[in-house]
Amino acid sequence: MKTQFIVLIVAIVFLQLLSQSEAIFSAIAGLLSNLLGKRDLRHLDLDQFDDMFDQPEISAADMKFLQDLLR
């Protein structure tokens, strides 16, 4: 009975190791395929950065208002 219990525990441990290592190996494989694969630059959305440059600088009146607000 002890031997069967030990074999069961060892089998459970090995199955856990196998399932966890499969997840790690798939994550590593996905990372390598992203690093070594062809990057698709045709569908790159650069329009998201246009909003950064459309905004005017903060005016002196706005700065004065913010300074008064934070006193």
Swiss-Prot record:
Sites of Leucine amide modification: 36
- Keywords from the named record: Amidation, Antibiotic, Antimicrobial, Cleavage on pair of basic residues, Fungicide, Membrane, Secreted, Signal, Target cell membrane, Target membrane
Q: Which GO terms describe its biological process?
A: defense response to bacterium; defense response to fungus; killing of cells of another organism
**Signal peptide residue numbers:** 1-23
Propeptide regions on this chain: 40-71
Sorted alphabetically, the Gene Ontology cellular component annotations on this record are: extracellular region; membrane; other organism cell membrane
Q: In which tissues is it expressed?
A: Expressed by the venom gland.
Where does this protein reside within or beyond the cell? Secreted; Target cell membrane
What does it do? Antimicrobial peptide. Is active on Mycobacterium abscessus subsp. massiliense (MBC=200 uM), a rapidly growing and emerging pathogen associated with healthcare infections. Also shows antifungal activities. Has a weak hemolytic activity on human erythrocytes (10% at 610 uM), indicating a low toxicity (therapeutic index (TI)=3.05). In addition, treatment of infected macrophages reduces the bacterial load. In vivo, treatment of M.abscessus-infected mice causes a decrease in the bacterial load in the lungs and liver.
| Family to which this protein belongs | Belongs to the non-disulfide-bridged peptide (NDBP) superfamily. Short antimicrobial peptide (group 4) family.
Please identify the protein, giving its name as recorded: Non-disulfide-bridged peptide 5.5
Question: What organism is listed for this UniProt entry?
Answer: Hoffmannihadrurus gertschi
Q: What is the lineage of its organism?
A: Eukaryota, Metazoa, Ecdysozoa, Arthropoda, Chelicerata
